[in-house]
Regions:
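Hydrophobic alpha-helical packing segments in soluble, helical-rich domains
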Residues: 16-33
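Charge-enriched, short contiguous segments at helix-coil
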Residues: 57-64, 68-118
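Charged, alpha-helical scaffolding/interaction elements associated with membrane systems
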Residues: 9-10, 48, 72
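Residue-level detector of well-ordered alpha-helical segments, enriched
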Residues: 12-20, 54, 58-61
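Short, charged amphipathic alpha-helical segments flanked by flexible coils
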Residues: 29-65
Length: 118
């Protein structure tokens, strides 16, 4: 995400979208997906319960935007789309690496105290 943010700050919006896509690929690899294609790897994250429906939809939208930036066409990524891509990618990172861990810690603490979480 550091490179994506740097590209955005330099007004290189297409490059920022490509870096966001690269971040998605990194998340999938780090989460242990077996599928090589990003579309299928994101589906695997969803099917394994690591992301939910709306986050999956967001991730797919980011993948498409990243593809738009990565493949030559007359269509470039504008500032608003790049800003949205950064925001959505940060939300996805927070969900997987922050909120999920906090929820699991909460559940474990409650369980060790003999309480139910829900």
């Amino acid at each position: 995400m550091i490179e994506a943010r740097a590209c955005f700050d330099a007004k290189l919006y297409t490059a920022a979208a490509v870096m966001v896509r690269r971040t998605l690929e990194g998340i999938c690899i780090e989460q242990g997906t077996k599928k090589r294609a990003l579309f299928q790897a994101l589906q695997e994250l969803r099917d394994d319960g690591k992301i939910e429906g709306r986050l999956f939809d967001w991730a797919q939208a980011l993948r498409v935007l990243g593809n738009q930036g990565a493949h030559f066409s007359e269509e470039s990524v504008d500032r608003e789309d790049a800003a949205d891509a950064l925001s959505l990618a940060e939300a996805l990172l927070n969900y997987i690496y922050v909120f999920t861990v906090k929820y699991e810690e909460f559940q474990n603490r409650r369980q060790s105290q003999g309480k139910t979480a829900g």
